[in-house]
């Protein structure tokens, strides 16, 4: 089956069409802007899968309807997912703009004095606003000379931010969310909303009963040689934690081996269901070999599966990580408890950064006073105002241990193409696999346990659906916190100590939901959240309006908020603008 091509970025150089001197004097400068933009994007960006980003430049500068149509014809067969229009001069607004209603688009108007690039930018954006096709504005802060071919830092930042978000939009379009199972324990996010996926993300939902996973395991619809490789890998790399179950619920060596085997098989089969696997065609399972074209998935697990079969913790943790028995590779996106809305936040984070995502319960707010009462320890530093305990039953990406290192030696999580095998091994070495607690998981399983290193910048996100309003996005930038070991042990043992932990301190603003740490916890819209490495809230804020999803809560500096220019016409308060504009334009793929 032919592999689906990755979306490309199109660069549209537009020009003043007046011949006999005007156009001729601008051709080289205009095309050089397009080439410089393409060079920047191809050098600085990659797809989440690690592949190089490709840019397609119009064959000619665009002065009017005919050349705009020729450009569009070229792009239509190149799988263009977003467009950037560039110009140093005046051009004819409605005659030259990109009119595709679902493709993210930006316009860079050169800030120079010789020709009025800013005038075209304003004129073209006015057309976009009037026609209901929002576009992003890019205009350098400082005037440049006409022969200056450099891209200023502020322009570069907007080009890259727009492109990252636009590629995320284009990469999700046409893919599917694999809903493996149904509603888990009444969790709202696992009431999978097909209209949300179709209308806002351009995706389909593939609903599959968990009996399909059982069938694939029981009928050996998998690569048996790969299973042996996975078992060998686990035997080499897995460290096992204590079994906290009562004696009557503890499994012997043979039973534990069977649980491990099935857990690894679950990972293999869920991956095959998402992506397909040509090896299955070799055993006459052609239909199953195709997969479901899923860019994200969720596994219900509890309780209809976990009351009798091993839980999904091991499978989900491995799939969400950047490595397995096949080595370092792109992490998948698999949501615990089929929480599709948290899965979408994971998907957004992965597409924006290329990194693995940490799925977690937003479990407990610990005030400084409560911690001092319980442990005798006084919080300081990043944790001085209190912390939030992020913990889930062992399905978080193992990258979340932060045993990878950046160029300065700091703990981090990296895109898979930057991760060494030694760093993958370090993440595995930092993880223990603890037998699942019988009271929760009667079918057994193994939960991963690690502790995230402190001082690492993270962005916590969540998508919620509000009846009458639609989807909204929450964003909280902050840091992981490292507590003294004895303090961590006391706090951790008050909950389930067999699960992975991140102590999180959000950055406070003193206002609204970020007045204090308690307010962050109190305003979080659901029981789950996602950690994405870095302070990348601004990228989420740029992605959200492309899909027409308003941001209901964030602590990103106002100077970093970058949305389509038409948002400014929806009032003077930038967050109210966001709600009114998203309501006005409606979901990107209106249904």
UniProtKB/Swiss-Prot annotation:
One of its GO terms (biological process) is D-arabinose catabolic process. The active site is at 337 (proton acceptor), 361 (proton acceptor). This is L-fucose isomerase. It is found in: Cytoplasm. Converts the aldose L-fucose into the corresponding ketose L-fuculose. Homohexamer. The gene is fucI. It catalyses: L-fucose = L-fuculose. SUPFAM superfamilies: FucI/AraA C-terminal domain-like, FucI/AraA N-terminal and middle domains. Its main location: cytoplasm. InterPro entries: Fuc/Ara_isomerase_C, Fuc_iso_dom3_sf, Fuc_isomerase_C, Fucose_iso_dom1_sf, Fucose_iso_N1, Fucose_isomerase, Fucose_isomerase_dom2_sf, Fucose_isomerase_N/cen_sf. The keyword Isomerase applies. One of its GO terms (cellular component) is cytoplasm. Belongs to the L-fucose isomerase family. Keywords: Carbohydrate metabolism, Cytoplasm, Fucose metabolism, Isomerase, Manganese, Metal-binding. Pfam families: Fucose_iso_C (PF02952), Fucose_iso_N1 (PF07881), Fucose_iso_N2 (PF07882). NCBIfam families: fucI, PRK10991.1. Its cofactor is Mn(2+). Its EC number is 5.3.1.25. Pathway: Carbohydrate degradation; L-fucose degradation; L-lactaldehyde and glycerone phosphate from L-fucose: step 1/3. GO terms for molecular function: arabinose isomerase activity; L-fucose isomerase activity; manganese ion binding. Gene3D superfamilies: 3.40.50.1070, L-fucose Isomerase, Chain A, domain 2, L-fucose/L-arabinose isomerase, C-terminal. Mn(2+) binds at residues 337, 361, 528.
């Amino acid at each position: 089956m032919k592999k689906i091509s990755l979306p490309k970025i199109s660069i549209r150089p537009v020009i003043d069409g007046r011949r006999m001197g005007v156009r001729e004097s601008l051709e080289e400068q205009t095309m050089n802007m397009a080439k410089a933009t393409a060079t920047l994007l191809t050098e600085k960006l990659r797809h989440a899968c690690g592949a190089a980003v490709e840019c397609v430049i119009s064959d000619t500068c665009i002065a009017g309807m005919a050349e705009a149509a020729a450009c569009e014809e070229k792009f239509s067969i190149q799988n263009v997912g977003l467009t950037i229009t560039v110009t140093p001069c005046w051009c004819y607004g409605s005659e030259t703009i990109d009119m595709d209603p679902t493709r993210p688009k930006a316009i860079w108007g050169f800030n120079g004095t010789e020709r009025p690039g800013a005038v075209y930018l304003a004129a073209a954006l006015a057309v976009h606003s009037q026609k209901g096709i929002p576009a992003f504005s890019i205009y350098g802060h400082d005037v440049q000379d006409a022969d200056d071919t450099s891209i200023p830092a502020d322009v570069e930042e907007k080009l890259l931010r727009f492109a990252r978000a636009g590629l995320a939009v284009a990469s999700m379009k046409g893919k599917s969310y694999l809903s493996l199972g149904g509603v888990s324990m009444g969790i709202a996010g696992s009431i999978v909303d097909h209209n949300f996926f179709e209308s806002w993300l351009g995706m389909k939902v593939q609903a599959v009963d968990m009996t399909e996973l059982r069938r694939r395991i029981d009928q050996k619809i998998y690569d048996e040689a790969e299973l042996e490789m996975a078992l060998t890998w686990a035997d080499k790399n897995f460290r096992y934690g204590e079994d906290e179950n009562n004696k009557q619920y503890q499994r012997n060596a043979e039973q534990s081996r069977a649980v491990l085997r099935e857990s690894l098989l679950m990972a293999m089969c869920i991956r095959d269901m998402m992506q397909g696997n040509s090896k299955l065609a070799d055993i006459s399972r052609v239909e199953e070999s195709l997969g479901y074209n899923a860019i994200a998935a969720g596994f219900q697990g509890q309780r209809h599966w976990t009351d009798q079969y091993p839980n999904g913790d091991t499978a989900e943790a491995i799939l969400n990580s950047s490595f397995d028995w096949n080595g370092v590779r792109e992490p998948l996106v698999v949501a615990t408890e089929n929480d599709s809305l948290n899965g979408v936040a994971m998907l957004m984070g992965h597409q924006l950064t290329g990194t693995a995502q940490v799925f977690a319960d937003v479990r407990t707010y610990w005030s400084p006073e409560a911690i001092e009462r319980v442990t005798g320890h006084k919080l300081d530093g990043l944790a001085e105002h209190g912390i939030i305990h992020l913990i889930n039953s062992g399905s978080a990406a193992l990258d979340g241990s932060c045993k990878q290192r950046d160029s300065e030696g700091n703990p981090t999580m990296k895109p898979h193409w930057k991760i060494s095998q030694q760093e993958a091994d370090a993440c595995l070495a930092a993880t223990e696999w603890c037998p699942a607690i019988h009271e929760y998981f009667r079918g057994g399983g193994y939960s991963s346990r690690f502790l995230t290193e402190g001082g690492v910048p993270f962005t916590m996100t969540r998508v919620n659906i509000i009846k009458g309003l639609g989807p909204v996005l929450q964003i909280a930038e902050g840091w992981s916190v490292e507590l003294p070991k004895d303090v961590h042990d006391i706090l951790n043992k008050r909950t389930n100590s067999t699960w992975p932990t991140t102590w999180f301190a959000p950055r406070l603003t003193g206002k609204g939901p970020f007045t204090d740490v308690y307010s962050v916890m109190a305003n979080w819209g659901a029981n789950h959240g996602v950690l994405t490495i870095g302070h990348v809230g601004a990228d989420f804020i740029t992605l959200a309006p492309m899909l027409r999803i308003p941001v209901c809560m964030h602590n990103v500096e106002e100077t970093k908020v970058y949305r389509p220019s038409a948002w400014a016409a929806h009032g003077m308060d930038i967050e109210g603008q966001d709600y009114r504009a998203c309501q006005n334009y409606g979901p990107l793929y209106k249904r």
